[in-house]
């Protein structure tokens, strides 16, 4: 009976979103506010005008019907302060963006394109067992991973819907371009074929079509960027997130760390390290990335 109780909700979730969702005229909005909400996208959802908005204090996104009454956003809101911080120099080739919080630990898991079957289910099940629900986790996801791993995606989405996880759906671009052996300055989002704006918006549309609300958090593939790429991301209303604790690279978390592991089975070493730290009591609690503070 236990196995059946798991299988039926997953099947129901898949069937629920078998219905057609049509997204049209999906365009960035000039940054204006309606009350405490900043409007970052306008679009047509199944024939109805909608807006993707972000609460300028909580940093949570939501979809709502279009409102005509707008005004300039509060310059001193959390959202705009974080945008300004993320958009400011210097612009390193690697690991630009916000890399550290003031307190707690922030778990981010990257879902880059992968030919490997399944996903790091052991990681998500471990935090679901360990912490009070819903457990905050950020998934920096790509469209190519979603398309190749639909069942894994639905499992993650279900855990979010039933309250086991509190998923922040982060943007890792749709395509995640990568050319083995090529210099970083001409790789990932700096590849000649990259259209970063389109790559970002395509991923957002893919999430919306699957019943998921995109967040305002973005991670550069390979953590590689330049000044132009950073400006592109922030002008779309997104906040780049780096890391100071890429576990598979030997970095260890400390108070305020943004932890990076891969949930796509491409880097099992990082997952093994995280699970060991969890067992040793060195991951006492997790915080949502929306709790990050500006300097």
PLM feature spans:
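Terminal accessory/targeting
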Residues: 1-108, 115-138, 144-151, 255-295
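Metal-dependent polysaccharide deacetylase catalytic core of the NodB/CE4 family, i.e.
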Residues: 129-231, 235-259
